Amino acid sequence: MQIINTIAHETIWGGEKLTPYTDVKSNKIGHLYSLVSNGEYESKILNGKYRGQLFKQYFDENKKRLNLNNYQEFPFVLALVDASDDLSLQVHPNDKIAKELEKTDFGKNESWYFIDAPKSGKIYAGCKAKTAEELKEKVSNGEYEAIIDYLEVTNGDYVYIEAGTMHAMAAGSFVYEIEENCNATYRVYDFDRVDVHGNKRPLQTENALKAIDVNKKAKAQKYNEEKVERLYSTKLFRNISSYTNNSETLECLTIIEGEDIIENYKIQKGTTIVLEPKETVELNNIDFIVSRPII
């Protein structure tokens, strides 16, 4: 069993909900990374045999034993996300576009579980433009409202955002996020906001227009069963006191409610525990989401 350190990431749209679960004193924490190994951020293991190691090293040394040898790198990133403001209108590339623009094997699909739904009751998801040509024309003219589509969401909803879908999380969202391990995000529009220095964040309009599929939509689903996507599966567990990994690969338990002490470490919202096959963890009636790589 490996307990993973959390990593706070401040953003222009972040808030205060994650501040109690990190040593970073900020009212702008957008992401609390629960498990990440993407070159920019690297999780560490806090306990046991691998204490002090980067998760990347653990994965590289053990992936064959864990039936994950088909992955060059760990396939997903886990985080809690606090959006006190709307995120930028953006898109992630599919595999084909990612290979062309990023020289990587995979694009990025992602899933959101809404612990708290946005204040408006809807997120940005999908595109109203009927063709790529119409999309390009509207973006060139700054007519963003003409192309933005919306999706209604409520507390407890699960939303799968497929690569190529134009999207943005909306203000008030508090989300468990699992995303494929690709760093590529192309901003279409950032609502003309500026940072503390008065600067706008850069847009990646040309790449975004290549990556957006105007036919891609998203839908909200109830999270009452295991969700199996391309590179990962997830399942929600509530009020659990003991959990055993009965799979043939590692599983990641990310706490979304409750706290406990395990091996002298405080386990709380945002903490991820990695269990190898047949390992068991005893917990104090905790709510968590189990994620597992597809093998």
Language-model regions: role of each:
Residues 1-130, 185, 191-219, 234, ...:
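Transition-metal
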Residues 73, 82-86, 117-120, 165-185, ...:
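Ligand-binding loop in jelly-roll beta-barrel domains
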Residues 78-79, 87, 110-113, 150-151, ...:
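His/acidic/aromatic-lined binding-pocket segments of jelly-roll/cupin-type domains
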Residues 128-141, 247-254:
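Short, basic/aromatic beta-hairpin or loop at an interaction surface
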Residues 138-147, 158-160, 166-216:
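An exposed, glycine/acidic-rich loop-and-rim segment of catalytic or binding clefts
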Residues 148-160, 261-281:
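Short acidic-glycine-tyrosine-enriched beta hairpin
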Residues 231-237:
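A surface-exposed beta-alpha-beta supersecondary segment
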